[in-house]
Design a protein with these regions (language model features):
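Short cysteine clusters
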Residues: 55, 79-82
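Short beta-strand His + acidic residue motifs that chelate non-heme Fe in jelly-roll/DSBH
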Residues: 86-87, 95
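N-terminal pre-ligand scaffold of iron-sulfur
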Residues: 1-72, 87-88, 102-122
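Short cysteine/histidine-rich metal-coordination sites, predominantly Zn2+-binding motifs
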Residues: 69-78, 93-101
């Protein structure tokens, strides 16, 4: 879906829930706090969580392959740069060099059969 735009910047991203099955993810661009950021949403057993695609340790995108954020067993999100592990439900570091840090969450709303991530103009 094409994001809604205010002043040329996407402020809302949405997708069909069916397009993000359990253990999978989707990337998007959104306007957040006066800048464009790449975000991603993950489906954890029917619960959806969204984060900025930025490792708090390495400062690089997390995906180890395009749009792949989960470890092979789908228990954690992982940073492809140095192998930091993050809890998908909270974004908190679960292991590796990210110790004490967490991913930056983005607000998620579920409406009918869609997931909606809302950005910010301020």
């Amino acid at each position: 879906m094409e994001p809604a735009r205010i002043d040329g910047a996407p402020t809302v991203w949405s997708a069909q829930l069916a397009d993000i099955p359990p253990g999978r993810s989707a990337k998007f661009q959104i306007h957040w706090q006066k800048r464009m950021v790449e975000g991603f949403v993950v489906n954890v057993e029917g619960r959806y969580f969204a984060y900025v695609n930025h490792c708090p340790h390495a400062g690089t995108p997390l995906d180890w392959w395009p749009n792949e954020f989960f470890t092979r067993d789908r228990r954690f999100l992982t940073c492809g740069t140095h192998g930091s592990l993050f809890e998908p439900e909270s974004g908190k570091c679960a292991g590796g060099p990210c110790n004490g840090r967490a991913l930056f969450p983005l607000p998620v709303q579920i409406t009918d059969d869609r997931i909606v991530v809302i950005g910010s103009n301020v």
